[in-house]
């Protein structure tokens, strides 16, 4: 009887050790996979005068490469950005910049031109306009919806300080084309292949929705700055 009990104990011990080893291996492999799939850049192209939220001298920089036509970017702005803003931007630890990506053609370009025009008029109003464009994105996002009329309507409704006549003129003349060209060059320089792409102090995340990984990269950067 005692031998049987001893055998059961040994069996349970072996099973426990196997499970522990498997879990440990999974955690290690998962950590290594994140480390290898995140893209680390040794030389960071300057983002110049991009729309930026937060303290200018914040220790950590987070950049979003996004497209107003992109549903995944809308979701990131609704699900992840509010956490980032509360935890790090509003506390002065992170400055957040946005770069337009034109992966969806004419509508992407038109919305980028409008956003750049609003930014030039009023950097604070820009962020309201930016948010409202994404909110206006319909469920059927693939159907054409970004038009000059729609963008002017958003500006009139949510950014009353913006000169609508000037915005309309800028859209008709593509006044901010040079700024949009700069965004396209940044997209190329950073090797952006999807939207949204999130870069934390030179590390582009493989999964932009992994807020824990975003936090890990920020906390690591903050410690390195001390």
Where are these regions (language model features)?
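Extracytoplasmic/periplasmic mature domains of Sec-exported, cell-envelope-associated bacterial proteins
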Residues: 22-27, 49, 60-61, 106-110, ...
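Flexible, active-site-adjacent loop/turn segments at secondary-structure boundaries
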Residues: 42-45, 51, 74, 101, ...
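Structural alpha/beta surface segment adjacent to cysteine/selenocysteine redox centers
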Residues: 66-69, 74-156, 190-193
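C-terminal cap of thioredoxin/glutaredoxin-like
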Residues: 1-31, 65, 81, 154-226
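N-terminal, intrinsically disordered, polar/charged segments of Gram-positive cell-envelope systems
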Residues: 30-64, 86
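Conserved S/T- and glycine-rich ATP-binding loop of Class I adenylate-forming
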Residues: 62, 70, 198
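Envelope-exposed proteins and targeting segments
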Residues: 58-61, 92, 194-196
């Amino acid at each position: 009887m005692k031998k049987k009990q001893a055998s059961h104990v040994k069996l349970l011990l072996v099973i426990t050790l196997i499970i522990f080893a498997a879990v440990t291996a999974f955690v290690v492999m998962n950590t290594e996979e994140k480390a290898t799939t995140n893209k680390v850049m040794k030389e960071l192209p300057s983002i110049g005068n991009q729309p930026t939220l937060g303290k200018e001298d914040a220790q950590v920089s987070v950049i979003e490469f996004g497209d107003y036509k992109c549903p995944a970017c809308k979701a990131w702005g609704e699900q992840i950005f509010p956490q980032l803003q509360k935890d790090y931007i509003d506390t002065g630890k992170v400055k957040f910049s946005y770069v337009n990506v034109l992966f969806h053609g004419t509508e992407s370009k038109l919305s980028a031109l409008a956003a750049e025009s609003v930014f030039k008029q009023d950097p604070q109003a820009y962020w309201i306009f930016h948010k409202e464009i994404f909110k206006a994105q319909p469920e059927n996002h693939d159907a054409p919806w970004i038009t000059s009329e729609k963008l002017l309507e958003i500006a009139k409704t949510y950014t009353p300080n913006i000169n609508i006549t000037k915005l309309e003129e800028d859209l008709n003349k593509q006044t901010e084309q040079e700024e949009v060209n700069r965004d396209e060059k940044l997209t190329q320089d950073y090797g952006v292949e999807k939207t949204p792409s999130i870069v934390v102090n030179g590390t582009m995340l493989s999964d932009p929705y992994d807020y824990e990984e975003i936090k890990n990269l920020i906390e690591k950067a903050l410690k390195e700055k001390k």
